[in-house]
A protein has these predicted regions:
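Conserved short histidine dyad/triad with adjacent acidic residue
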Residues: 65-70, 82-97
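Ligand-binding loop in jelly-roll beta-barrel domains
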Residues: 75-76, 112, 132-158
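A short, N-terminal "cap"/entry segment at the start of jelly-roll beta-barrel domains
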Residues: 23-79, 166-196
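Bacterial N-terminal signal peptides that target proteins for export
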Residues: 1-10
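Bacterial N-terminal signal peptides
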Residues: 10-19
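Short acidic-glycine-tyrosine-enriched beta hairpin
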Residues: 117-133
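Glycine- and acidic-residue-biased ligand/ion/polar-headgroup-sensing regions
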Residues: 99-101, 105-111, 116
Length: 196
C-alpha cells in the first residue's frame, strides 16, 4: 500500500511538472537552478499555522504543515508540493486559487469534499483535481487526522502559507483579524476565501 501511495504521488508530481512546461530537445538538459531532492515523509520546511484571534475550530489552533518543494526548497519555479493534516471534525475553509490548478491526494481517512457545485464523500487514497478558480472545501468526517498531499501547478500559495505561519520550533504569535485580512489582501492572486 505504501508503495502504491509513493508511486501515485510520484505520478502526480510528474504529471503536474511536465504539464506546465514545454521543452524542446535542446532544452532537455536541466539548466535551471533547481536541485533534485529525495525527502522522507517528515522532511521539508516544517511550519505551524498561526491561530487567528477570536477564531474557532481549526483557525484557533496552530496546525502543522510541510512545504517540500518550491522556490525555497529545491528551487522549483514551476510547482509547489507539500503535506498537511486536517484534525477530526475540522475543515479547510471554502476557497479558490485564481492562478494555479491544485491536486489533493488524501492518503487516509474519510472526508466530504465540496468542489465547485459538486459534493462527494471520499476515503483514503482519493485524488481531487481542482482547476484554477474552482471553489473547494474539505471536511474531515472521521475520528483520526486526515493526511494529504497538495500540489500546485504554479507558485504563489506557498507565500501566503509562510505569511500565516511560523517555522516549527519558533514562538507562535496569534494573528489579529486585521493582520489576517491584510495577508489575504496581499496574496489575493494566490488564494481567495469565501466570506464566512
Amino acid at each position: 500500500m505504501r508503495t502504491l501511495k509513493a508511486l501515485t504521488t510520484c505520478a502526480i508530481l510528474t504529471l503536474v511538472a511536465t504539464s506546465s512546461l514545454t521543452v524542446t530537445a535542446d532544452e532537455a538538459v536541466n539548466t535551471s537552478k533547481a536541485t533534485p531532492l529525495i525527502l522522507e515523509k517528515n522532511e521539508g520546511e516544517k511550519r505551524l499555522w498561526r491561530p487567528i484571534e477570536g477564531a474557532k475550530g481549526w483557525n484557533a489552533v496552530p496546525g502543522p504543515f510541510i512545504l517540500k518543494v518550491d522556490r525555497h526548497n529545491g528551487g522549483s519555479s514551476h510547482l509547489v508540493f507539500g503535506t498537511e493534516d486536517i484534525p477530526p471534525g475540522e475543515s479547510i475553509d471554502r476557497h479558490r486559487h485564481p492562478g494555479a490548478d491544485e491536486i489533493l491526494f488524501l492518503q487516509n481517512g474519510h472526508a466530504r469534499v465540496h468542489l465547485g457545485d459538486r459534493t462527494r464523500e471520499v476515503h483514503g487514497d482519493a485524488t481531487v483535481f481542482i482547476p484554477a478558480n474552482t471553489w473547494i472545501e474539505v471536511t474531515n468526517l472521521g475520528t483520526e487526522p486526515i493526511s494529504f498531499v497538495f500540489v500546485f501547478s504554479a507558485p504563489g500559495f506557498e507565500n501566503f502559507m509562510r505569511a500565516e505561519s511560523t517555522p516549527e520550533g519558533q514562538k507562535i504569535t496569534p494573528l489579529t483579524k486585521a493582520e489576517d485580512a491584510q495577508i489575504q489582501k496581499e496574496h489575493g492572486h494566490a488564494v481567495i476565501y469565501a466570506e464566512p
